[in-house]
From Swiss-Prot:
Belongs to the pancreatic ribonuclease family. GO terms for cellular component: extracellular region. It comes from Giraffa camelopardalis. This is Seminal ribonuclease. Disulfide bonds join C10-C65, C28-C80, C35-C42. SMART domains: RNAse_Pc. It is found in: Secreted. It holds the Pfam family RnaseA. Gene3D superfamilies: Ribonuclease A-like domain. Its main location: secreted.
Length: 84
């Protein structure tokens, strides 16, 4: 999964959420929280979402990047603007 999703790039960390756009947008009407940057337009999801965390391993370099893949669930925080 990680290598296919990161073709053409070799970032140290990539995180991919496995939710529909509608489900992510719905978080904007859930629990309001303070953002890490101090702003007040962040919202936390009521339930956990499925995600995949991809972390570059060792000294692998582009174009042969290698990643450790971890699948998990956690609640997310999103910054919302306007109605989204």
């Amino acid at each position: 999964f990680c290598r296919k999703m990161t073709q053409g790039k070799c970032k140290p960390v990539n995180t991919f959420g496995h939710e529909s756009l509608a489900n992510v947008q719905a978080v904007c009407s859930q629990k309001k929280v303070i953002c890490k940057n101090g702003l007040s337009n962040c919202y936390q999801s009521n339930s956990a979402i499925h995600y995949t965390d991809c972390r570059k391993t060792g000294s692998s370099n582009y174009p042969n990047c290698a990643y450790k893949t971890t699948r998990a669930e956690k609640r997310i925080i999103v910054a919302c603007e306007g109605n989204l």
